Amino acid sequence: DEVRWSPGFNFNARFFDRIFLTEPDRGDWESMIKLIQDSLTDEAIERAINQWPENVYAQTGEKTINTLKARRDNLTDYSMEFYESLAKRVNVLGTDKKELFLIQNLSKDKVRVTVHKLSKKGNIEQVIYDRTFTSNDTKEIRIYGFDEEDQFKISGDVKSKVNVRIIGGKDKDEVFDLTANGSAKNVKVYDRKSTKLGTSASSFKSRLSNNPDINNYNKNEFKYDVLLPLVNGSYNRDDGVFLGGGFMYTQHGWRKEPFASRHRLMANVAVATGAFNIEYKGDFTNVIGQWNLGAVIDIKKPEVNNFFGLGNESFYDVD
């Protein structure tokens, strides 16, 4: 009856969900959960399952009713765990038409993103996206403008803890820093060198390039972070059998392939002598520009010394 890990339960829709479930916030999810729970009464569930053919109901009817009731009762826990997985890093997608993207640093913990459609003459039309992000739920927002000449305006009087990436398109975009006191430092801009970046006083960071890859959007980019257990066994004539284990933890990040970081920790101990070794290996992608970083820490405590003295007259002590 239990859904052990709801983000994994929705594995097959992991790309779809990160395209079409980017606007609802925590309050929207909580409202929808309550609506579903109020609608799925015990009577409604029982009435639906009781319509099954008798031979089918006899096999799984009661179990299905109990499972549905249990999942309804626990829907808040399952759904909010899934929401938190989706909300951690959010893609805000424009279209191949002109848009105005407003990024407002409301406070150090809140950022509001609003997307307006622009007419061919540049007049502001209807809102096509509006969401206020909180730092408790969201660590990073990635805004993709795509084609046509888009405008991005950053405003607010305080730097937010929510990081924002603006990824423009192949046409001439405009990015304006309307903040006070350099409050756009949480924003990074990725676009062509033809992009207009407002004034020289802009406080956001920019990475401009004529390489078309700078504007790339990969709808299948999402990967789950993975924690794997490791086991190990070995043997040598001095210490005998070594047994041990550890873990490997892989984290993924934006435009970091094949991963952002990978940590591997192993520990082994000799059953007979008590000798042990501990090894940590870390790999980090694109730490500085295109430069990667690797780190290795190896700790050993041997219990056997095979040094018997200098020269050819030394005696081999078997013990």
Q: How should these model regions be labeled?
A:
Residues 155-156, 167, 174-301, 306-308:
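Outer-membrane beta-barrel initiation region
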Residues 1-130, 136-142, 148, 154-163, ...:
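C-terminal catalytic region of ATP-dependent kinase domains
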Residues 5, 29, 52, 254, ...:
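A residue-identity detector for tryptophan
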Residues 310-318:
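Flexible, surface-exposed loop regions and adjacent strand-edge segments
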Residues 133-149, 240-252:
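Hydrophobic/aromatic-rich, well-ordered segments within soluble, folded domains that form packed cores
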Residues 129-141, 145-146, 259-273:
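Acidic, aromatic-enriched beta-alpha/helix-loop junctions
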